[in-house]
């Protein structure tokens, strides 16, 4: 039997006992989706502050070519950093569009980068399985091979040398 609260990110013994969480996913922010971007900034200004913890469960961005490209998402980075600087907790999970989102971006926003393995957290006595969802595409072996490659630490160190 699993414990009721499990670690949510690699490398620490921290567990997530949630007080007042909100979960968002699949925003696919890009310069070409201005209405979605406006809705995100409105959410960050008016709604997110009502919650103690914000979980972004993947695909915050339409695409992410690496943490060295963080300048592309400057206003988003600032909004997330302001949220975490206010004393709230920000958690970030990679999706299938932003799987190269990494520790540098998490540090820039004050976020905890969630482990690639699907974590379980507890809120109000209820266990919640956190997942972007792409790992459940088990009938697509080509995608699963691509996903495994993109999340392989050895491959990621060579990623800037790769041609997409």
Locations of the language-model features?
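Core catalytic region of metal-dependent phosphoesterases/phosphodiesterases
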Residues: 8-9, 14-24, 29-123
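Histidine-centered catalytic micro-motifs
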Residues: 24-29, 130-136
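Hydrophobic, well-structured mid-protein blocks that either form specific transmembrane helices
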Residues: 114-120, 124-135, 141
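Active-site-proximal loop/helix segment associated with metal-binding centers of metalloenzymes
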Residues: 131-164
């Amino acid at each position: 039997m699993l414990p009721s609260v499990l670690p949510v990110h690699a490398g620490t013994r921290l567990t997530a006992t949630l007080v007042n969480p909100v979960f968002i996913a699949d925003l696919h922010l890009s310069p070409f989706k201005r209405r979605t971007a406006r809705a995100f900034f409105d959410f960050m200004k008016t709604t997110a502050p009502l919650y103690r913890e914000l979980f972004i469960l993947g695909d915050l961005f339409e695409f992410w070519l690496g943490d060295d490209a963080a300048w592309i998402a400057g206003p988003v980075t600032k909004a997330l950093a302001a949220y975490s600087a206010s004393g709230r907790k920000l958690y970030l999970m990679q999706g299938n569009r932003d799987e190269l989102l990494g520790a540098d971006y998490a540090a820039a926003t004050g976020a905890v980068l969630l482990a690639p393995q699907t974590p379980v957290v507890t809120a109000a006595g209820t266990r919640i399985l956190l997942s972007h969802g792409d790992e459940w595409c088990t009938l697509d072996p080509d995608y699963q091979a691509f996903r495994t490659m993109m999340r392989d630490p050895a491959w990621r160190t060579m990623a800037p040398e790769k041609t997409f």
